[in-house]
Structure formats: C-alpha cells, structure tokens
Amino acid sequence: TGSFQSQDKFKCFVSIAGISDFTKLLRSETFFRGSAKMNKIMHGDAFEDKEYLDSVSAINYTDKIKKPILLIHGTYDTQVPHNQSSMFYNKIKNSNDSVEYFEIPKATHYFDEQGNRFVMFREIERFLAENLN
C-alpha cells in the first residue's frame, strides 16, 4: 500500500510475494481450502468488505504509481498465488516503465531453499543499487 498511499516517502518499492488484489485473492480457491471462518476473521469477507479491500489493493491504483517497483514471486507459493504479482505487472507496465517482475521457479512463499533466497536477495540488491543511488 505504500506504493500508492505514501509514494513521496520512498524512492522505490520492492514487493516480495505480495498481494495486489485482496478481493480476488479472498475469492480464490487458495483461501477456500482452509477454514472459511478463520479466513474471514483474519482477512475479511470478499463480498461484504469489497469496498475496503479494493481501497487497499494496489492493482486499483496502477495509474498513480510512478516510482520504480521490483516484484518478486515464487512459482510454488501456496500462500499468495504468483498470479497476484504477474497480473499486477501486466496492468502497471503500461503506465510505469520502471517496474520489473522477477519470478523464481519452484520458490515458495517463504523462499525456504537457500538457493532461492540467494537469487531473491541478489535481485533486490541489484534493484536497490540502481534506484537508491
């Protein structure tokens, strides 16, 4: 949310396995696999709370986000599907040419394997070096 609510405070943004569309995520099968009641308590209801969820979903503000963004997501993420990052990238790339999407094959939500963490941190380091000069 900082990318669209507090842009002036940052030079760039890094999103690691981030949620870009809360409503879509809560309506997906990923969140119906677990306890529906627990998901509603923790995250809200995708139908009853749609207005609020849309207001905190970055995908609805892509035209306002002008700072560089690095999106990193693992393809084996079972907590937040990697399409949350890819659909955000596909929408924002037309209005922000400083956005990068880096997908890490077989990486989980927590980047459990050391090799995946190394790749992730290497990309973050490169991106920050380029954008924080």
Question: Predicted regions span which residues?
Answer:
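Active-site-proximal cap/loop segments of hydrolase catalytic domains
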Residues: 1-133
